Design a protein with these regions (language model features):
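Beta-sheet repeat architectures centered on beta-propellers
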Residues: 1-168
Length: 168
């Protein structure tokens, strides 16, 4: 349980594991499910302590929701495919107006394709300068924002300058 974020967490061992190393979390306020991997076997919500405490299989006790440590991995968030209409039009992207809290600590990359089984084309990384010039086309576009591993960051609503470019 993580009452601060309206979440209930379930931990379980992956198919090859003998200890809990995977989770399913449910945000009951937003009705959102999340899955992932993290080595935790038990925990207690805030109340007795200021933050939740969870314990790993190796016996290390973690104070959750304090600071930021990405374990050497770059944190990211990625959209699903974005299309105009039902994908019948090509989208020409010309720019981006980012909403990012710590300018310079987050980059954006884009992947485009013209058909669902087509090879994706990569564009970027682009800094989150305000505004950012872009130039690429595709019927489906995915955006990934990747943060610096040594800083705390957040991203709000991103806006793209995109126009329909025909049905070719």
């Amino acid at each position: 349980m993580n009452s601060r974020f309206n979440e209930i967490w379930w931990f379980y061992p992956s198919a090859s594991g003998t200890e809990c190393d995977s989770y399913v979390a449910f945000d009951y306020a937003e009705n959102i499910w999340t899955t992932g991997t993290i080595d935790r076997t038990a925990g207690v919500d805030r109340g007795v302590f200021r933050q939740p405490f969870w314990i790993a299989a190796d016996g290390i006790l973690y104070e959750q929701e304090v600071g930021f440590d990405y374990g050497g991995q770059a944190p990211f968030a990625e959209t699903g495919p974005i299309a105009l209409g039902v994908g019948e039009n090509v989208m020409a992207v010309r720019g981006m107006i980012p909403d990012e809290n710590t300018l310079g600590d987050v980059n954006a990359t884009f992947k485009t394709r013209f058909y669902p089984t087509d090879t994706e084309r990569d564009y970027g990384p682009y800094s989150m300068a305000n505004p950012t010039s872009l130039r690429f086309t595709g019927r489906q576009i995915r955006m990934r924002v990747t943060g610096n591993t040594s800083s705390d960051w957040r991203v709000g609503i991103m806006r793209l300058d995109a126009v329909a470019g025909g049905r070719r």
